[in-house]
Amino acid sequence: MRKLRIGIVDLVARAPTRAIYSKVMNANLAGIMPQVLAVWCEELGHDPHVICYTGFEDLAAELPKDVDVVFVSAFSQSGQLAYAISNLFRQRGVVTVLGGPHARCYPEDAARFFDYVLGFTDKALVAEVLEERAPYPAGGRVMAAPKHPMELPSLEARWKYVERTLEKAPLIKFVPMIGSLGCPYTCSFCIDSTVEYQPLGFPQIAADLKFLLTKHKAPIVGWHDPNFGIRFDDYMTAIEQADPNHRIRHIVESSLSLLSEPNLKRLRANGVQAVLPGVESWYDMGNKSKTRRTGMDKVEQVAEQINMILRYIPYVQTNFVLGLDTDEGDEPFELTKKFVDLAPGAFPAYSLLSAFGRAAPMNLDYQRAGRVLPVPHHFLNNNHAMNVKPKNYDWPAFYDRLVDLTSYSFSGRAIMRRLPATPTFIPKWMNVIRAVSSEGWGRIKYHTMLRGRLDTDRELRGFLDGEHSKIPEFYRERVTRELGYFAEWLPKGALEHDQNAYLKSEAALVPIRARAGRAAPAA
């Protein structure tokens, strides 16, 4: 096979943005797999060109020219942008390939607009695609490896792609690393709940960290593990061996069950500066919390633990999912407000319940019940739309509570209380920037606007109530405006999708259950 010129587009952003927090952080959210893909393409004898779109570039100008194949990596929020990019390249005779979360969640829809749609991806699968590289105008080929790859290219092999992306980060630069794939927990709303936990090689982790120290004096590593520290001793030993002088700082997403005080002492000693635990709900949720308590008892226990974590780790973000079927009335929202008061140093990150196609076993139940709405992918970023009709609320009642909770959490009073409860300067600064930018005040403004439209926009309200499936003008206008130039390249029908495709597929003929969770190894 001749040497191919390959474009790889990592869509961190769904559209152009000018948000302060996005400017600071988006480059740090670059995916690892686009970089891995580039290394595999090199090893197969090809010439890859990687672009990470953060929302601040002129994407039309940066897209690679004169390529044979284009790979696009996208979350569902970038689905419409990905479809437009694919259409642009297909018009030029270029074969297009979609990977990433959107490909796994919506393969049937993505295959309408891409030649190849890849689920789990390994080097052999990439080689097969490049060998064939055939256009499929009548419907793309959906392919997947049997499971995640057992190993990934080293940080040294990825470095030139990491370095180019981090040049876009103006202040804080996170080097992306990963030590495990999948998750042992059983949260039925999570894309990893049915993916077997698979640690990658700890000797390779140590080697990567040693290499990183040859490039930066005091680097920050952003770990992409779905749940960092399941094999806690192995992680800590690898870090200690690679960085005995504790020059590296780490940011991790972990579960409360792993954040005991002895573990926190070791995390602090090894440079962990930020943790992002999932609270999810004040009711039982997949064994990710070490408590079996619910309601106010859980609020008090979790707040106590979060305050203890803040004595060791300077930055804590707590993750919540709003609109779950266990939520009813004012209580879950009032409990969260109480938590904000009891643990003022934690930054609360709220996600609206979303059913991302095939992402999670729970989505089948929502589809069987007729509760999933065909909201355009562009809005499925956990905040700009909720595509599952709430079980125990009508839309005005839900948004009244959402606006109230968000306003409470990012009020001037809450921001000021967060400052003294956060121990060091950079975390204080980050919390303020996030609160007054798109993640705090921006969401208050958006949720308030949408709540108002529920009373005045009959087309939108009817769509959200499931009375019709016609995409409301509200969504069409925003997609057109936000995509700008790329709106012209949206293929016909790109805003619509079959929200019940998972249910209709052959896989759904057999009941799918989240596999039984396994106890995490003792620390």
Provide a role label for each language-model segment:
Residues M1-I8, E42-D47, K65, E163-T165, ...:
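Radical SAM enzyme core and accessory elements
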Residues R2-H216:
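Acidic, low-complexity intrinsically disordered segments
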Residues R14-R18, D109, Y185, R231-F232, ...:
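Flexible glycine/acidic-rich beta-alpha junction loops that bind and position SAM and/or redox cofactors
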Residues A38-D47, K215-H216, N270, Q305-V316, ...:
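A structural motif corresponding to the C-terminal end of an alpha-helix
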Residues G100-C105, L256, L322, S354:
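Short beta-alpha junction loops
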Residues D109-E128, N270-V275, T336-Y350:
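Structural recognition of alpha->loop->beta junctions
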Residues P153-T326, E334-K338:
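Radical SAM [4Fe-4S] cluster-binding motif and immediate context
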